[in-house]
């Protein structure tokens, strides 16, 4: 299926590009989330009419994400979990916990934006986590996990 991208999609293309994707990917993900439209002649004409408006909106989103990224860069998140003597946690620290703590600190972050490269954190110590605010803006945040003995 050929589609027109209404937003930048990682590993697929940028705003305004006409790309060919599998039908299921288009029907079940790209079109329902508003990232693409079917590439019919009417849709192409409508897109060209709205192109400047969509590019301006995309630039505003990028600028807002960059501004938030500058504030968020270098932030340290401190979390306390119950841990054993050897430093292993009884449970784990997930992207939900990190996003919740960042929201308490005043940053507007959704759990899907927090990227844990090695899965949930299961040991006490400092870890570096990536927060993807936009497809072009990713910020490194330090997560310090402290153990609390039972």
Curated annotation (Swiss-Prot):
Pfam families: Ribosomal_L9_C, Ribosomal_L9_N. One of its GO terms (cellular component) is ribonucleoprotein complex. InterPro entries: Ribosomal_bL9, Ribosomal_bL9/RNase_H1_N, Ribosomal_bL9_bac/chp, Ribosomal_bL9_C, Ribosomal_bL9_C_sf, Ribosomal_bL9_N, Ribosomal_bL9_N_sf. One of its GO terms (biological process) is translation. GO terms for molecular function: rRNA binding; structural constituent of ribosome. Keywords: Ribonucleoprotein, Ribosomal protein, RNA-binding, rRNA-binding. Binds to the 23S rRNA. Belongs to the bacterial ribosomal protein bL9 family. This is Large ribosomal subunit protein bL9. It comes from Acidovorax ebreus (strain TPSY) (Diaphorobacter sp. (strain TPSY)). The lineage of its organism: Bacteria, Pseudomonadati, Pseudomonadota, Betaproteobacteria, Burkholderiales.
């Amino acid at each position: 299926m050929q589609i027109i991208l209404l937003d930048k999609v990682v590993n697929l293309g940028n705003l305004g590009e006409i790309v060919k994707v599998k039908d299921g990917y288009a029907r079940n993900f790209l079109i329902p989330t508003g990232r693409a439209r079917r590439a019919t002649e009417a849709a192409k004409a409508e897109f060209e009419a709205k192109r400047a408006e969509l590019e301006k909106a995309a630039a505003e989103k990028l600028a807002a994400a960059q501004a938030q990224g500058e504030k968020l860069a270098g932030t340290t998140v401190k979390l306390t979990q119950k841990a054993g003597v050897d430093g292993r946690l009884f449970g784990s620290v997930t992207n939900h916990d990190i996003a919740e703590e960042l929201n308490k600190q005043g940053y507007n972050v959704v759990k899907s934006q927090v990227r844990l490269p090695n899965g949930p954190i299961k040991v006490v110590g400092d870890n570096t986590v990536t927060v993807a605010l936009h497809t072009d803006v990713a910020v490194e945040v330090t997560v310090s996990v402290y153990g609390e003995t039972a």
